[in-house]
């Protein structure tokens, strides 16, 4: 039976209190994100329906369910997960910094930094030789898209004396996941991928409505990450995966991520189980607007995207550069 683990942070509490007293643009943007609901907990939310479906699959029924802070350190988000110092995700144009060392977490994979340093979890690993967890949550997305997305990460660590984890184990878990969501007859393929915290990494694509669609990324836990958490890679091994709310959008035919956040009863009443299908509501048709402007060629476009969101807020699903001309 699954066990809920909530990891709280006094440091996060203090940072949020300090943030509430600030009125600068950066602080207002961060507060806007923190005020958004976590849809993995909201009834009639496609994201919660997806998560509930997953935790009831045979492999995941006994996994720990982990909740951890939304404001974390760069060490917890990047360093411990083997992220290079020059990785784009570390830039202030891609990540919300509260100060030099504290950020809004950018991915749920950062739960490793809390779960793998939890005393009771480590005691269980030593005693039983295996630990496993799922961590759902709301994370900050890149600044050109809707301001938040939901991600679900899975992690299994075990002693090699108990079993050696291979890429086949990784594929088996992903196939079970895909079949559990899309049905037993789903067609899939694997593509080699790369993540700083895993090796032998894979992207899984499924055939859906005549098109190949990426559904998740996964890999074997990187030995350096195990070392970073004080676990000897000669003794321990494991696998990990992660996917986002796009899975719910694909499965339920949701064309616009803003629909996932709606409280309109005409929308929320449509989502009852994993096989629910979205039907168009006239209030939410997608429209496109082109804007032309002259800017300094050295400007970072993420800053412009942020300004658009400051004014339009959740009316905007995505801002992107279509073309550029330099004279």
Where are these regions (language model features)?
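Class II aminoacyl-tRNA synthetase-like tRNA-binding/catalytic domains
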Residues: 2-145, 157, 212-240
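Short histidine-centered catalytic/ligand-binding loop motif
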Residues: 39-43, 152-168, 289-297
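Generic alpha-helical secondary structure
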Residues: 43-51, 163-174, 297-305
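Short secondary-structure junctions
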Residues: 58-63, 179-187, 309-320
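Beta-rich nucleic-acid/ligand-interaction surfaces
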Residues: 64-93, 184-210, 321-327
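A conserved active-site cap/scaffold subdomain adjacent to cofactor or substrate pockets
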Residues: 126, 146-179, 228-262
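Short glycine/proline-enriched loop/turn "hinge" motifs that connect secondary-structure elements
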Residues: 141-149, 281-283, 327
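A carboxyl-terminal module marker
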Residues: 191-327
């Amino acid at each position: 039976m699954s066990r809920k683990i909530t990891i709280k942070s006094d440091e996060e509490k203090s940072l949020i209190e300090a943030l509430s007293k600030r009125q600068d643009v950066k602080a207002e943007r961060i507060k806007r994100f923190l005020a958004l609901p976590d849809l993995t907990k909201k009834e009639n939310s496609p994201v919660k329906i997806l998560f509930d479906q997953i935790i009831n699959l045979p492999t995941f029924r006994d996994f720990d369910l982990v909740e951890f802070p939304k404001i974390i350190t760069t060490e917890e988000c990047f360093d411990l997960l083997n992220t290079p110092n020059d990785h784009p995700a570390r830039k202030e144009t891609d990540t919300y910094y509260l100060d030099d060392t504290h950020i809004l977490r950018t991915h749920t994979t950062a739960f490793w930094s809390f779960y793998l340093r939890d005393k009771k979890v480590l005691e269980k690993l030593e005693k039983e030789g295996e630990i496993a967890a799922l961590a759902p949550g709301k994370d900050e997305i890149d600044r050109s898209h809707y301001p938040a997305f939901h991600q679900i990460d899975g992690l299994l660590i075990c002693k090699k004396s108990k079993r050696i984890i291979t890429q086949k184990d990784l594929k088996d878990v992903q196939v079970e996941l895909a079949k559990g969501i899309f049905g037993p007859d789903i067609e899939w393929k694997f593509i080699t991928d790369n993540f700083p915290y895993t090796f032998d990494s894979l992207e899984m694509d499924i055939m859906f409505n005549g098109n190949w669609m990426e559904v998740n990324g996964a890999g074997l836990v990187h030995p350096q990450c195990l070392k970073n958490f004080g676990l000897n890679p000669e003794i321990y091994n494991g696998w990990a995966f992660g996917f986002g709310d796009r899975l719910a959008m694909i499965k339920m035919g949701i064309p616009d991520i803003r629909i996932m956040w709606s409280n309109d009863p005409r929308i929320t009443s449509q989502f009852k189980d994993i096989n629910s299908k979205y039907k168009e509501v006239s209030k939410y048709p997608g429209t496109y607007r082109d804007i032309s402007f002259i800017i300094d060629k050295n400007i970072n476009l993420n800053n412009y995207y942020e300004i658009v969101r400051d004014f339009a807020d959740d009316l905007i699903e995505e801002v992107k550069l279509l073309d550029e001309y330099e004279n």
